[in-house]
Design a protein with these regions (language model features):
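Short, positionally conserved secondary-structure boundary motifs
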Residues: 1-52, 84, 91-95, 106, ...
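A short glycine-leucine-enriched loop at secondary-structure breakpoints
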Residues: 53-57
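Structural motif
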Residues: 59-60, 74
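Hydrophobic beta-strand signal
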Residues: 63-64, 77
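Short acidic low-complexity segments
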Residues: 64-71
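Short, compositionally biased
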Residues: 72-86, 90-96
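Low-complexity, intrinsically disordered Gly/Pro/Thr-rich segments
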Residues: 101-112
């Protein structure tokens, strides 16, 4: 399950302390660090460049929590007209907009004509470096 302790098995020094003692550490669980509600959390990969201004790059792994109440200015994964998208939720003058974080993309106004569901709120992003 990825939990436990890292043990460096270098024997017990009878003289000077082992240099490996400086590197002993507890193993962390990414589930414990990143997932607050296991039953409502899922992961998805970013595809595209529309959210680069928010630090979400192509192929990043998003941690998404469906139990968090959507709010103005939160980044959400939404299903609109048959497609998934990740955008910032903006409420302006009583209207809901899906705002990209890249000036090359236009905001999407959500209207009654759209098939629309907010799937969840992005809580974390996992990146490769």
């Amino acid at each position: 399950s990825g939990e436990g302790t890292i043990i460096i098995n270098s024997g017990i020094a009878a003289g000077f302390p082992s240099p490996a003692d400086d590197f002993k550490q507890n193993r962390i669980s990414l589930d414990n660090e990143l997932v607050k509600n296991k039953e409502a959390t899922f992961f998805a990969r970013v595809s595209g460049q529309s959210m680069i201004g928010a630090g979400l790059d192509d192929n990043d792994l998003l941690v998404i929590d469906r139990s968090i109440e959507p709010q103005n200015n939160k980044i959400a994964v939404c299903f609109i007209d048959g497609e998934f998208t990740v955008k910032r939720l903006l409420i302006k003058k009583g209207k809901l907009w899906l705002q990209p974080e890249n000036s090359e993309f236009k905001a999407i106004e959500v209207t009654n004509e759209n098939e629309f569901v907010i799937w969840g709120i992005v809580t974390n992003v996992i990146k490769k470096v």
